[in-house]
Amino acid sequence: MKQIFITAFILFVSVISFAQNKQADAAKAVLKQYKDAVEKLDVTGTEKLFTADSKIFESGGSEGNYAHYLEHHLGPEFKDFKSFKYNDYKVEVTVDGNYAFATETYSYVIVVAKDNAEVKRKGVSTSVLKKVNGEWKIMVSHNSSRK
């Protein structure tokens, strides 16, 4: 009887762990979609990756929700870029129920279209994702960088 209990417990823990990993991978996929769009300098359709009431913070400032950030920050900024490339990208995600907490670390290089100047930075982003109708969406994103 003791052996059956131990086996059942181990199986239960394994199933829980697998489910957590699957959810973490799904949240990571959302972050990857956003990262890939930024690298392409084409964020068309990325609104679907964010909650309507999302909050975006960048380098100490509040950028409003994602729609506002896209219209007043990313959109205009991308017009000045020739390229944007992430390097050394790492992401860690912890899932707790309908919320996922992510930390991304990376370096990036931006090439400015006007004069081909390179801007090199190290960055970190923290995000809170929320499961909405079965899909992970970015609810809060905070990123900062340094030379």
Model region roles, listed by residue range:
Residues I4-V13:
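Sec-dependent N-terminal signal peptides
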Residues S14-A52:
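Short, low-complexity N-terminal intrinsically disordered segments enriched in polar/charged residues
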Residues N98-Y108:
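A short hydrophobic beta-strand element
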Residues K114-K120:
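A short acidic/glycine-rich loop-to-helix N-cap element
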Residues K122-K147:
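Short beta-strand edge/turn micro-motifs at domain boundaries
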Residues V43-V95, T105, A117:
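A solvent-exposed, acidic/Ser-Thr-rich amphipathic alpha-helical stretch
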Residues V109-A113, K147:
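Sequence/structural signature of outer-membrane beta-barrel proteins
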